């Protein structure tokens, strides 16, 4: 598994519209080689036709508290290509990185996050997550803080829209552009409608629809270009990966937990794997 494929500056641009249809027999041969190589060799396996990007889910959340700056830095330290995060807008319109719709599970506070202001959110401390005892006064990051971290650590930003306002889209795109990350960034969502708003401000930011791979879903997105499907691991097959590639879509697979799962996905030709773990 190639965790950071090629030069960061090239980002996603080389992959756009250039999905390769790999000979099935060759794929089987490559998968066989991967399976017999020791795990320490898999991360260095870099054939020109196999360049699967590893994205840290909420950063490297198996090792650090999710959706925090330490988690994103850890993803970079582990050599991950990208860092996925979750985006909310607050009562005052501020944009912050957080997964849940309330702060109860992850912080020393209670309440719905969208009912809070940035000042109120920054007054909270994150008190849950892996290795949380290492940290005191760990804070919920803003979108700007996340983007600064990605830029500094050469991570591709992968931003899931959790609950934001349509009026926030331009601000999100402007912030991505302002940090010099427009060519590399990915926005994902369970609603395909967001691609229409994103395309008003950028054609360079890739949009990935969190859904199944189907011709129906592909047709919802295809006309807007630079798109993909973000699909759960148990919903992906060689056939629907081929369908996506034939229609110019990239395939990002999430909920991947083991090297065995990753090897299978490499074998059927997926483009990206999202995981809490460093998969060798």
Task: Give the residues covered by each predicted segment.
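Phosphate-group recognition and catalysis centered on beta-loop-alpha active-site segments
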Residues: 4, 21-27, 34, 38-280
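Short, Lys/Arg-enriched N-terminal segments with co-localized hydrophobic residues
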Residues: 1-18
């Amino acid at each position: 598994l190639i965790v950071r494929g090629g030069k960061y500056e090239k980002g996603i641009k080389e992959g756009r519209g250039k999905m390769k249809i790999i000979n099935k027999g060759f794929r089987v041969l490559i998968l066989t080689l991967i399976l017999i190589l020791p795990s320490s060799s898999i991360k260095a396996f870099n054939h020109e036709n196999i360049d699967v990007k590893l994205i840290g889910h909420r950063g490297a959340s198996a090792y650090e508290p999710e959706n925090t700056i330490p988690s994103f830095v850890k993803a970079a330290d582990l050599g991950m290509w990208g860092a996925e995060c979750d985006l909310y807008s607050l009562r005052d319109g501020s944009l912050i990185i957080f997964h849940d719709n309330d702060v109860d599970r992850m912080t020393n506070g209670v309440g719905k996050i969208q009912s809070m202001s940035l000042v109120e959110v920054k007054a909270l401390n994150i008190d849950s997550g892996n290795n949380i005892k290492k940290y005191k006064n760990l804070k919920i990051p803003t979108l700007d803080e996340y983007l600064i971290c990605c830029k500094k650590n050469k991570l591709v930003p992968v931003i899931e829209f959790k609950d934001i306002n349509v009026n926030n889209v331009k601000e999100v795109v402007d912030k991505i552009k302002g940090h010099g990350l427009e060519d590399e960034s990915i926005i994902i969502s369970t609603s395909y409608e967001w691609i229409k708003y994103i395309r008003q401000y950028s054609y360079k930011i890739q949009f990935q629809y969190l859904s199944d791979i189907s011709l129906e879903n592909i047709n919802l997105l295809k006309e807007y270009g630079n798109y993909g499907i973000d699909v759960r691991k148990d919903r992906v097959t060689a056939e629907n990966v081929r369908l996506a590639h034939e229609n110019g879509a990239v395939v990002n697979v999430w909920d991947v937990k083991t090297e065995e799962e990753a090897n299978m996905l490499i074998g059927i030709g997926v483009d990206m794997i999202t995981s809490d773990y460093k998969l060798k």
